């Protein structure tokens, strides 16, 4: 007997599976890279991630997501499924998930087993966003894939199809995997999103009736058109299914102008370091030096790549961007700044969002 279909938000909403039960949650999420601050260890970073998740849950955010990155001494997010489990037990209502799981790095069966286990632990609260990028450098990707040469463009659709089959779509009669199951066997599925920072992800999501999540923080020039096209070209997997999208945006909200400058300088340094293959945590004095330089201050422009400033301004601008992209949710990305300042920014933004919406 064919297993139930999965992968679209509206079907899951109709049957009450895989969606938040928070009727008053905001259409806001947090994407956390679980950064390791200078001078601290990974244990402190993971504990800090729990603190952030609990703070944004209390502030009314709908989701808390962690990323998958490898070979980064400045990040503690190489095993997002474990972070989800750790955060899940110390929160009560916010949805927790990965944004994403880089599917070419993993066997689809193993991903299905991990997320079914998470759903058994935290029913109705687990999200799974899928990506096709490696989340790391080429050599690390080679090791993760045990030397297998992967062509994501050619192989990714098949990997997604296999994952959906393990999660509930089922394999066709006579398929060699049709007698196997992804254990534990449960009646619930994670809420699925397809990640993208190019046209590929939203197009794939539209053609396959999936939720879409676009990384404005990586490709700001493509985001709005890509998500509008996704909504216009959405093909439902089942009658009545509707498009559902989220857009991640670099944002920092504070009344403190120096804190805003530090965030902008920190992100500028992070990008510069990545281009030079420097993966260590930022030194606070580096950030202060850049933020205090006249050259940096004079070059600050409102180029649309990030939204920073007083909470009222940030909330109003994000609402405008949400409408412009025809997105259902905004995913806030706030790296390269101290955890205390991140938490304060998230809380201030939520308060300002309620007043502005």
Task: Give the location of each predicted region.
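Conserved, mostly hydrophobic/aromatic
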Residues: 28, 60, 68, 87, ...
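Active-site mouth loops of central-metabolism enzymes
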Residues: 32-47, 101-108, 186-196, 302-310
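An alpha-helical appendage that flanks or caps ligand/catalytic pockets
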Residues: 12-22, 149-181, 222-327, 354-357
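N-terminal beta1-alpha1-beta2 module of alpha/beta enzyme domains
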Residues: 2-94, 357
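Flexible, glycine-rich active-site loops centered on histidine and acidic residues
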Residues: 23-42, 104-171, 212
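Hydrophobic faces of well-ordered beta-strands that scaffold small-molecule active sites
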Residues: 28-32, 64-66, 96-98, 126-130, ...
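Acidic (Asp/Glu)-rich catalytic clusters
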Residues: 22-23, 84-92, 119-125, 206, ...
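A conserved active-site cap/scaffold subdomain adjacent to cofactor or substrate pockets
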Residues: 202, 206-218
